[in-house]
């Protein structure tokens, strides 16, 4: 049962992280398309937002490993 729960948690975390990164990149590209002069600031915000969006799946995978090995 723990193996199944850990696998589901890791899989959902990976899918959630991929969706979050896709939304962030999509919004950045739309912003750059509308206002090319803001490219630098939008790119900076994207480079801050992507790791924050990836932090939650990484934590979920760590929790699933803890659940798996205890």
Swiss-Prot record:
<dbReference type="InterPro" id="IPR005953">
    <property type="entry name" value="ATP_synth_csu_bac/chlpt"/>
</dbReference>
<dbReference type="GO" id="GO:0046933">
    <property type="term" value="F:proton-transporting ATP synthase activity, rotational mechanism"/>
</dbReference>
<comment type="subunit">
    <text>F-type ATPases have 2 components, F(1) - the catalytic core - and F(0) - the membrane proton channel. F(1) has five subunits: alpha(3), beta(3), gamma(1), delta(1), epsilon(1). F(0) has three main subunits: a(1), b(2) and c(10-14). The alpha and beta chains form an alternating ring which encloses part of the gamma chain. F(1) is attached to F(0) by a central stalk formed by the gamma and epsilon chains, while a peripheral stalk is formed by the delta and b chains.</text>
</comment>
<keyword id="KW-0138">CF(0)</keyword>
<dbReference type="Pfam" id="PF00137">
    <property type="entry name" value="ATP-synt_C"/>
</dbReference>
<keyword id="KW-0375">Hydrogen ion transport</keyword>
<feature type="site" description="Reversibly protonated during proton transport">
    <location>
        <position position="54"/>
    </location>
</feature>
<dbReference type="InterPro" id="IPR035921">
    <property type="entry name" value="F/V-ATP_Csub_sf"/>
</dbReference>
<dbReference type="GO" id="GO:0008289">
    <property type="term" value="F:lipid binding"/>
</dbReference>
<keyword id="KW-0406">Ion transport</keyword>
<keyword id="KW-0812">Transmembrane</keyword>
<dbReference type="InterPro" id="IPR000454">
    <property type="entry name" value="ATP_synth_F0_csu"/>
</dbReference>
<keyword id="KW-0446">Lipid-binding</keyword>
<dbReference type="GO" id="GO:0033177">
    <property type="term" value="C:proton-transporting two-sector ATPase complex, proton-transporting domain"/>
</dbReference>
<keyword id="KW-0472">Membrane</keyword>
<feature type="transmembrane region" description="Helical">
    <location>
        <begin position="47"/>
        <end position="67"/>
    </location>
</feature>
<dbReference type="InterPro" id="IPR038662">
    <property type="entry name" value="ATP_synth_F0_csu_sf"/>
</dbReference>
<protein>
    <recommendedName>
        <fullName>ATP synthase subunit c</fullName>
    </recommendedName>
</protein>
<feature type="transmembrane region" description="Helical">
    <location>
        <begin position="5"/>
        <end position="25"/>
    </location>
</feature>
<keyword id="KW-1003">Cell membrane</keyword>
<comment type="similarity">
    <text>Belongs to the ATPase C chain family.</text>
</comment>
<comment type="function">
    <text>F(1)F(0) ATP synthase produces ATP from ADP in the presence of a proton or sodium gradient. F-type ATPases consist of two structural domains, F(1) containing the extramembraneous catalytic core and F(0) containing the membrane proton channel, linked together by a central stalk and a peripheral stalk. During catalysis, ATP synthesis in the catalytic domain of F(1) is coupled via a rotary mechanism of the central stalk subunits to proton translocation.</text>
</comment>
<dbReference type="GO" id="GO:0045259">
    <property type="term" value="C:proton-transporting ATP synthase complex"/>
</dbReference>
<dbReference type="InterPro" id="IPR002379">
    <property type="entry name" value="ATPase_proteolipid_c-like_dom"/>
</dbReference>
<keyword id="KW-0066">ATP synthesis</keyword>
<dbReference type="GO" id="GO:0005886">
    <property type="term" value="C:plasma membrane"/>
</dbReference>
<keyword id="KW-0813">Transport</keyword>
<keyword id="KW-1133">Transmembrane helix</keyword>
<dbReference type="InterPro" id="IPR020537">
    <property type="entry name" value="ATP_synth_F0_csu_DDCD_BS"/>
</dbReference>
<comment type="function">
    <text>Key component of the F(0) channel; it plays a direct role in translocation across the membrane. A homomeric c-ring of between 10-14 subunits forms the central stalk rotor element with the F(1) delta and epsilon subunits.</text>
</comment>
